[in-house]
Structure formats: structure tokens, C-alpha cells
């Protein structure tokens, strides 16, 4: 408690009275000294006048001067007497003001006593009402405790049954893992066989490319020989026509011997020129043509044999591909079954395998139908089916083994580039007027791309080199620098330039054909890419859903803990105080908070049960956060509230701080234990959710019931802790009441000592005033020098008295406001505002002293005589102690104390 308010007021009152009396006495003494000095001067002047009577003639001028000085001194003495009368009038005015102040103080004291009595009656009524409410809450909490114990026993039995089911599921999972490992080993063996078959296919591709080059070379030589034969036939026809013309001329007119000799010479010259111009005879050309035709027949026979061997290899490859697709479909079905059992999601795994199977069958039929037309079309379809199956195999491998996502994205990019190249090749082959050479070149261009998608980057650069080597007739103008372009664009540009060189067409025309083909195939490629992205993002979606479900479970646990704390009825006065403090800090009403949390909790459950989407969940979350932000305020207000509450409770930190710290530490330790138990149960819940294939919803509900059971037990423990804290606070209140009684006794002792001190000071003041009266009567001579300092003490006295009155009124106003603002804290303490009562008693003591002084100051001599007042403070303290004793006797023993 603060013991400094009333001694300060006592000292201020004593200082004002003593200083005022002392200043008046000092002024009177000073005036007496001046009168004595003036009397001495007059005596000396008279002596000098007697001495100088003999020298009257010489001292006439000096005598006149002294006479003038005496006249002036008399005037000053009259002025001093006038000032004395004025000061007496002022003192009478101050006495009247003092009487008015005393009357006001009496009125204020009566009003304070009335307010104190009203506050005490209100506090007693509120205390009795709170006791009745606490008793009813204790009875309800006992019933709830019994019900919670029964529920705890039932949930423990259910937990044992669930543990047995978990063990059975673990055994089933081990068996499934063994089957999965066997399937993985068989899949690896099939992959090795597929790699060997692919290698054989590539060897056959290389041989076919060489055969195609040889056939092209032989075709070019045959074309050249055919052109020469046609030229020779034209020359022979021309000669025959000329011979016929000459014969006709000869028949018309027969020449002479000279003309005949001349003509024979010309014919010989023409024959020589013809022999020199054509060293090989037409017979030799016909022999070469026959040889070339025989070679063409042999090459066609070899092509037929190679085609038959290729058909056999393709049939074998198709058989192995079908087996691979079947095993892949089985593996995907098994994987989907595992994922459904672990996460409860439905995936259609057989879709991609069926698509790949259909593509492969379509490629086989296309190969059989178009075998007679061109080998390039069949190879393009076979490459597309192979790329499809290769992509499906990569996707299945990534889903089983779990390769990084960057590799999957790279694979998708490579596959898209290969599809573009295949579409370019198909458009070039399907153009009207294109030769089989173009189809073979397109096959040779797409072959390295497949190598690029299956091998590393170094092998891809080697294949790009082979593309250049396949086109020896290409001009150096068409070469492209590979440093400035990516690998995929480099390969596409090579294929386009080779097609341009072979067909001898413009680049714009080739690009226009490619644009048309891409626009026609755009829709189909978009649908296939969409399906591929769907199959690729299944695993990512499952991971995201798993993470979202975990985070939502955590949010649910936090919200359920908060709602349980808010819905729990407080069973004692201390917990009631704490809950009210929390509501003040956060500005949340319990009903509003519980409704908001229940709505958000329902949204979380709907999201987990797939009844709502992420949009609705995000809306609920944003609304909850907005509500929380709108109902919070700064921590500075919280600190001020805490200080006010501590002042209201008269918190004794030196005595109960260590006890409170120990209790808080115990509460924190027990809360940590409960939190670890909740975390272990949440981990068990997550494990059950991951392991159970069929009974996921039922297991989740049981685990949530177990978690609720644990939270209920935690709430029961918190109730017990709050009850212990309540008992501790009641003991502290009792100790504080005892301490208050001791303080009251010390205040009474100090009041007695104060009265004794005032008696001693009053006797001293009486002696000083008597001395002043004696000196005033003895000194009737006027004062020579009037001073203006006598008005200053009176002004100081009036200013001090007015400031004291204003200060007491302000304190009275503040105490009235504090009473109006803090009735709840006074009711909770059960002491009825002990600090305000303490201040009121101090003010009452000061008012009693002032009233005694005012009664004693009715006489003009300012005599202060103390008077004893019957009742007053002692009766007030007796009332307070009687109420405290009644409150102690009415306390009900706590049933949970043991």
C-alpha cells in the first residue's frame, strides 16, 4: 500500500499554518526594532540640541534641518500605522475565507463517508451472489467429470481393437511388398529384352539405309545410260532422214563422176567423225543397259528378302511389345490398388496401356497395308508407336521408382520434338509427286532423334553428325551452325534442308507445308499432351493432397483445442478472472468466437471428405482471418490492463510472485506433457491413414475420437490446476486481509503520534503569539520605514490554502471515477476497494485536523487547540474488520481440495 499520501498533506497543512504565523511575528519584531532605532535617534538629537544650546546662534540652521527631519519621520510613522491597520483588515478577511474552507471540507467528508458505505454494501451483495454461482458451477463440473471418465473407458477399449486391425494391415502390407518386388524384377528383365530388340532394329535400319543408297546410285546410272541411248536413237533417226533426202536428190538428177567422188569423200569424213564422237558402239550401250537391269533385279530380290526379314523382326517386336504392355497394365493396376488403399484416390491406370496397345496395333496394320507402296510410311508409323510405348514406359518407371521431376519434364520435351519430326516426315511422304527417296531420307532423319531421346547428350551429337553424312550432295550454303541453336531445333532444320535439297523446292513452300500439317494435327496432339500431363501430374497431385490433409489436420486440432477451452464452464473464481482477462485482451466474445471456429472447422472436414473444394476453404479461411484482425488491438493496451488489474487486486509481488511462478511452471510442464501425448496420437492417426486400404473413414473417426478424449483429459487436468490456483488465491486474499488489519493498526498509531506532534507545535505557536502581544503593547511608537514585504506572506498563505483545497477536490474526483470504473475488480477481491478506503480514511483524518485548527483559529491570536472526536475513524475501521470477519466465516470449503 502507498503510505505517502496523508503524511504529505499533514506536512503541507502544518507548513502553511506555521509559516503564516511565523511571518506575522517576524514582521512585528522588525517593526519594533525600527521603532527602537528611531527612538534612539530622537534621544541622540535631543542630547545634541541640549549640548548646542550655548551655540544657538551658530546652530540655528542645523536646528531647522533637524526639525524638518523630525517632521518627515512623523509622517513615516503615520504611514506605518496605516499599513498596520490594513494588515489587520486583511487578516480578518483571511480568517473568514478559512472558515468557509472548513465548512467545505466538512461537507466533502460527509459525502466521502456516504460513498464508502454504499460501496461496501454493493461489494457484500456481489460477493454473496458470486458464491452461489460458483457452487452451481462446481456441481455441474463434477457431473461432467464422471461422464468423461465413462467415455474414457469406452474409448480405451476401442483403441485396443484398432491396434489389432493395424497389426493385421501391417502383415498384409508386407505380403504386398513381396509381390511388388517380384513384379519389379520381371519388369527389369522385360526392359533388358526390349533394349536388345531395339538394338537389332537399329542395325536393320542402318542396313536398309545402305541398301537404299546403293539403289539410288544404280538408278542414277541407269537414268544416265537411258539418256545416252535416247540421244543415239535421235541421231540415227536424223541420219536416216538425211540419207533418204540425199537418195531422193540423187534419183532426181544423177551426178557426174566428180560429184560421186566428192560425195563418197564426205560420207567417209562423216563416218570418221561419228566414230570419233562415239567411241562406244550402240551394242556396247545395250550391253551396259542389260547389266544394269540385271543388277536392278538382284537388288529388288535382295530388298524383298530384307523386307521379309524385317517383317519377321517387326512381328517379333510387336509380340514383345504386347507382352510388355500387358505386364505394364498389370503393374499399373497393382500400383493403383496400392494408391487407393493408401490415399483413397481412384486412378485409371489401364487407360495409357490401352492407348499404347491400340497405337501399336494400328502401326502393325498400317505396316501390312502400305508395305507394297513404300517402306517409309510403315517405318514412320512404327516409330510413332515405339515412341508412344517408350513414353509410357518412362512414365511407369518414374511412378514406380520415383525419379526427379526435372527428368520427367525433359522426357516430355524430347517426346514433343520427336512427334513434330514424325509429323514433318509424314507430310513430306504424303505430298503428291514425292519420290520414295524422300521417305527414306525422312526415316534416316528421324532415326537419330530416337537415339537422342534414348541416349545421353554425347550420343545425340554423334547422331546429328550422321544426318549430315547421309546427304553427300548437299551444298555448303545449306549448312547450319549448331553452336547458336539448341539441339532439337538443329535436328529439325537439318531435316528441312535435306528435304529442300532433294526436292529442289523453295524454303517458303516447305515451311508452308509444315504449317498446314501442324495446324491439321494440332487438335489431336493437344488432346494427347493433355492426357500425358494428366498422367504425369497424378503423383504430384497425390503428394499435394497428402500435404494439404496433414496441414488441415493440424488446423483442426488447434481449433478444437481453442473451442474446448472456450466452451468449458469455469468452476472457480480465479478461472473466471482469467477468462475475462483473455476476452478483454482479444476483444472476442465467447459466443462469436465459438461460432466462427465451428464454421471454419466444418469447412476443414468438408475439404478432407471431398465435399468442398479449395475455393470454399480459402473463402472460409480469409473470412476467419479478417474477423480476427478486426477484433484485435495492440499489446500496449494489454500491458495497461494488466497494470490496472494488479492495482485493483493489490498484488503482493514480494510474497506471492514466487508461488505464482511455480504454479505457472507446473501448468506449462503439464501442458507440454499433454501436447506430446497429442502429437503421438496424431502420428498414430497419420500412420493409420497411410496403412489402411479400406476402412479409412472409420479409422479417421476413431482416431479423432481418441484425440478428443485426450483433449478432454487435458481440459480436466486444466480444471484441476485452476482449482488449485483458486485455493492459492483465496489463501493469498486471507493473508492480504490480515496484512490490511495490521496496516490499519499502524495507521491508528501514526494518527496518535501525529496528534501528539500537533499538540507540541501548538504550544510553541501559543508562546510565540503571547510574546508578540506583549511586545505589541510595550511598543506604541510608530515605525519609520514601511515595507511591502508584509503582503507577501499573506498572499502565499492564501495561495497555498487555495491550492490545497483544489488538490483535495481533484483527489476526491479521481477517487470517485476510480470507484465507478473499477467495481468488478473490487467485487472479485471481496475487499470493497481497500485502496480507496485507505485514501478516504487518510483524507478524513486530515479533515478532522483541519476542522480542529479552524475551530482554534476563531480568535485573532491564531491559537490551535486539538479536539477529540468520538466515533469517526475508529468506528469506520470496526465496520471494515467486521465485514472481513463475516466474509471469512461465509467461505465454503472446496470439494476438490484433496
Swiss-Prot record:
Biased composition annotated in UniProt, kind: Polar residues: 460-469
Name by which UniProt lists this protein: Filament-like plant protein 7
Gene responsible for this protein: FPP7
Comp. bias intervals (Basic and acidic residues): 808-822
Transport recorded as keyword: no
Compositional bias of kind Low complexity: 434-459
Statement: the UniProt record of this protein carries the keyword Electron transport: no
Subunit structure, as described in the record: Interacts with WPP/MAF proteins.
InterPro entries referenced in this protein's UniProt entry, alphabetically: FPP_plant (IPR008587)
The family this protein is said to belong to: Belongs to the FPP family.
Region feature (Disordered): 429-482, 693-723, 777-835
Coiled-coil region(s): 23-224, 287-320, 703-764
TM stretches of this protein: none
Species in which this protein is naturally found: Arabidopsis thaliana (Mouse-ear cress)
Keyword vocabulary terms for this entry: Coiled coil
Amino acid at each position: 500500500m502507498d503510505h505517502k499520501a496523508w503524511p504529505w498533506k499533514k506536512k503541507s497543512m502544518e507548513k502553511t499554518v506555521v509559516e503564516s504565523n511565523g511571518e506575522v511575528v517576524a514582521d512585528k519584531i522588525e517593526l519594533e526594532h525600527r521603532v527602537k532605532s528611531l527612538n534612539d535617534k530622537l534621544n541622540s538629537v535631543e542630547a545634541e540640541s541640549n549640548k548646542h544650546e550655548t551655540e544657538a546662534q551658530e546652530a540655528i540652521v542645523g536646528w531647522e534641518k533637524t526639525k524638518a527631519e523630525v517632521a518627515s519621520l512623523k509622517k513615516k510613522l503615520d504611514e506605518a500605522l496605516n499599513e498596520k491597520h490594513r494588515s489587520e483588515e486583511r487578516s480578518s478577511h483571511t480568517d473568514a475565507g478559512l472558515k468557509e474552507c472548513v465548512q467545505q471540507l466538512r461537507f466533502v467528508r460527509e459525502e466521502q463517508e456516504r460513498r464508502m458505505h454504499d460501496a461496501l454494501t454493493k461489494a457484500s451483495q456481489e460477493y454473496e451472489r458470486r458464491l452461489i454461482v460458483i457452487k452451481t458451477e462446481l456441481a455441474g463440473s463434477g457431473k461432467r467429470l464422471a461422464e468423461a471418465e465413462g467415455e474414457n473407458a469406452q474409448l480405451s477399449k476401442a483403441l485396443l481393437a484398432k491396434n489389432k486391425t493395424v497389426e493385421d494391415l501391417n502383415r498384409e502390407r508386407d505380403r504386398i511388398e513381396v509381390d511388388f518386388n517380384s513384379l519389379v524384377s520381371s519388369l527389369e528383365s522385360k526392359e533388358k529384352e526390349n533394349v536388345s530388340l531395339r538394338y537389332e532394329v537399329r542395325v536393320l535400319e542402318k542396313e536398309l539405309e545402305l541398301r537404299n543408297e546403293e539403289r539410288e546410285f544404280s538408278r542414277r546410272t541407269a537414268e544416265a545410260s537411258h539418256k545416252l541411248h535416247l540421244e543415239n536413237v535421235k541421231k540415227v533417226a536424223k541420219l536416216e532422214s538425211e540419207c533418204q533426202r540425199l537418195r531422193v536428190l540423187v534419183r532426181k538428177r544423177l551426178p557426174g563422176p566428180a560429184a560421186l567422188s566428192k560425195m563418197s569423200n564426205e560420207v567417209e569424213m562423216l563416218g570418221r567423225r561419228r566414230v570419233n564422237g562415239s567411241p562406244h558402239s550402240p551394242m556396247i550401250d545395250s550391253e551396259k543397259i542389260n547389266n544394269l537391269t540385271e543388277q536392278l533385279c538382284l537388288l529388288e530380290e535382295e530388298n524383298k528378302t530384307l523386307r521379309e526379314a524385317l517383317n519377321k523382326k517387326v512381328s517379333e517386336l510387336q509380340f514383345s511389345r504386347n507382352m510388355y504392355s500387358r505386364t505394364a497394365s498389370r503393374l499399373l493396376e497393382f500400383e493403383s490398388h496400392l494408391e487407393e488403399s493408401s490415399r483413397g484416390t481412384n486412378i485409371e491406370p489401364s487407360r495409357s496401356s490401352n492407348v499404347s496397345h491400340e497405337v501399336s496395333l494400328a502401326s502393325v496394320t498400317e505396316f501390312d497395308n502400305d508395305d507394297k507402296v513404300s517402306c517409309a510410311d510403315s517405318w514412320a508409323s512404327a516409330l510413332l508407336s515405339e515412341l508412344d510405348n517408350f513414353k509410357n514406359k518412362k512414365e511407369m518407371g518414374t511412378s514406380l521408382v520415383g525419379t526427379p521431376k526435372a527428368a520427367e519434364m525433359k522426357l516430355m520435351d524430347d517426346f514433343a520434338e520427336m512427334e513434330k519430326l514424325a509429323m514433318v516426315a509424314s507430310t513430306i511422304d504424303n505430298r503428291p509427286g514425292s519420290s520414295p527417296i524422300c521417305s527414306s531420307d525422312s526415316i534416316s532423319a528421324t532415326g537419330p532423334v530416337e537415339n537422342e531421346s534414348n541416349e545421353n547428350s554425347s550420343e545425340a551429337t554423334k547422331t546429328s553428325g550422321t544426318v549430315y553424312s547421309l546427304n553427300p550432295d548437299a551444298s555448303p550454303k545449306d549448312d547450319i551452325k549448331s553452336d547458336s541453336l539448341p539441339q532439337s531445333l538443329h535436328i529439325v532444320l537439318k531435316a528441312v534442308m535435306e528435304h529442300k535439297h532433294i526436292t529442289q523446292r523453295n524454303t517458303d513452300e516447305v515451311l508452308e507445308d509444315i504449317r498446314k500439317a501442324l495446324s491439321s494435327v494440332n487438335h489431336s496432339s493437344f488432346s494427347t499432351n493433355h492426357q500425358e500431363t494428366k498422367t504425369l501430374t497424378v503423383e504430384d497431385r497425390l503428394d499435394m493432397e497428402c500435404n494439404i490433409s496433414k496441414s488441415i489436420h493440424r488446423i483442426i486440432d488447434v481449433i478444437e483445442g481453442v473451442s474446448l477451452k472456450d466452451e468449458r464452464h469455469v468452476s472457480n473464481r480465479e478461472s473466471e478472472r482469467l477468462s475475462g482477462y483473455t476476452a478483454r485482451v482479444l476483444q472476442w466474445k465467447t459466443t462469436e468466437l465459438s461460432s466462427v471456429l465451428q464454421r471454419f472447422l466444418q469447412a476443414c472436414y468438408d475439404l478432407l471428405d471431398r465435399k468442398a473444394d479449395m475455393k470454399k476453404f480459402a473463402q472460409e479461411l480469409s473470412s476467419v482471418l479478417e474477423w480476427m484482425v478486426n477484433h484485435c488491438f495492440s499489446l500496449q493496451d494489454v500491458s495497461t490492463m494488466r497494470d490496472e488489474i494488479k492495482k485493483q487486486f493489490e498484488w503482493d509481488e514480494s510474497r506471492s510472485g514466487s508461488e505464482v511462478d511455480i504454479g505457472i511452471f507446473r501448468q506449462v510442464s503439464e501442458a507440454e506433457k499433454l501436447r506430446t501425448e497429442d502429437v503421438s496420437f496424431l502420428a498414430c492417426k497419420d500412420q493409420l491413414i497411410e496403412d489402411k486400404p479400406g476402412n479409412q473413414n472409420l479409422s479417421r473417426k476413431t482416431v479423432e475420437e481418441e484425440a478428443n478424449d485426450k483433449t478432454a483429459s487435458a481440459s480436466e487436468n486444466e480444471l484441476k490446476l485452476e482449482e488449485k490456483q483458486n485455493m492459492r488465491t483465496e489463501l493469498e486474499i486471507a493473508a492480504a486481509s490480515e496484512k490490511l488489519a495490521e496496516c490499519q493498526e499502524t495507521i491508528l498509531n501514526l494518527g496518535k503520534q501525529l496528534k501528539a506532534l500537533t499538540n507540541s507545535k501548538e504550544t510553541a505557536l501559543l508562546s510565540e503569539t503571547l510574546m508578540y502581544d506583549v511586545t505589541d503593547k510595550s511598543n506604541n511608537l510608530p515605525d519609520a520605514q514601511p515595507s511591502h514585504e508584509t503582503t507577501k506572506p499573506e498572499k502565499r498563505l492564501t495561495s497555498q490554502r487555495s491550492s490545497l483545497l483544489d488538490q483535495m477536490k481533484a483527489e476526491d474526483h479521481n477517487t470517485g471515477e476510480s470507484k465507478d470504473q473499477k467495481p468488478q475488480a473490487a467485487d472479485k477481491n471481496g475487499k470493497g476497494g481497500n485502496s480507496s478506503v485507505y485514501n478516504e480514511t487518510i483524507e478524513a483524518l486530515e479533515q478532522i485536523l483541519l476542522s480542529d485548527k479552524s475551530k482554534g483559529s476563531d480568535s485573532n491570536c491564531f491559537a490551535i487547540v486539538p479536539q477529540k472526536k468520538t466515533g469517526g475513524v475508529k468506528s469506520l475501521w470496526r465496520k471494515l474488520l467486521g465485514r472481513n470477519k463475516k466474509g471469512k466465516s461465509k467461505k465454503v470449503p472446496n470439494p476438490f481440495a484433496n
